[in-house]
Amino acid sequence: MDLHSDIVILDVQKNILLTSSQLSSADAYETFPCFSSDGKKLYFCSAPAISLPDSFNFVQYNLCSLDVDLEKGVLGSRIDTVIRVDTLNASLSFPKISPSGRFMLYTRHAYGNFSIWHRDADLCMYDLQSQREIDISVLNSEEAESFHSWSSEGHWIVFSSRRMTGLFTCLYLAHIDSLGHAGKPFLLPQKS
């Protein structure tokens, strides 16, 4: 649960901190930042600030983006909402952009931002070119699927799942083809 949640960008080469009222509003919780593969957009999750902790199960995060020019140290002036949750009655977290820049993998769950504790948490994929959801339901189970990451060439993902017992988390691998279709996931081998 975030009582305060803002985003800043640290340029370690120039030793400067980039921030904006767009990313540190008292009216919203901003979290889970990630850059587009070309570094020209910052994707993140944002939810309207509400009374916490008494209303924590009503916090729902949208997926947003902001243009950035890291060479000049300039952040855009307008936040774009990529996926709105008001029609989904869900919360979104962990946006990760594929190395090709075409796909955004993220987690959808009922509320909040710590999805591993939500049995309903599922992985979802959004095609940033066509601006449409891609069906990757083959990756999901009755238990939580949560944190995930792309391989460096963008044809594989690794993700956390509690599908075996619902009590502990294991890592699964799945192939993603050039159209964003997911193959059947398999348990990450633990021994040779």
Task: Describe every region a protein language model picked out.
Residues 37-38, 99-100, 152-153:
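Residue-level detector of Asp-centered blade-edge/turn motifs that repeat once per structural unit
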Residues 32-34, 94-96, 147-149:
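Conserved beta-strand position repeated once per blade in WD40 beta-propeller domains
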Residues 39-43, 104, 157-158:
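Hydrophobic beta-strand positions that form the internal "hydrophobic ladder"
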Residues 1-7, 23-29, 45-67, 83-91, ...:
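A flexible loop/linker signature enriched in serine peptidases of the S9 family
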Residues 98-99, 125:
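Predominantly soluble domains enriched in secretory-pathway, periplasmic, or organellar proteins
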Residues 156-160, 174-177:
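Short basic/hydrophobic patches in alpha-helices and adjacent helix-turn junctions
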Residues 8-29, 67-93, 125-144, 175-192:
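Multi-bladed beta-propeller domains
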Residues 146-147, 154:
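C-terminal, well-structured subdomains that either form a transmembrane helix-short loop-helix hairpin
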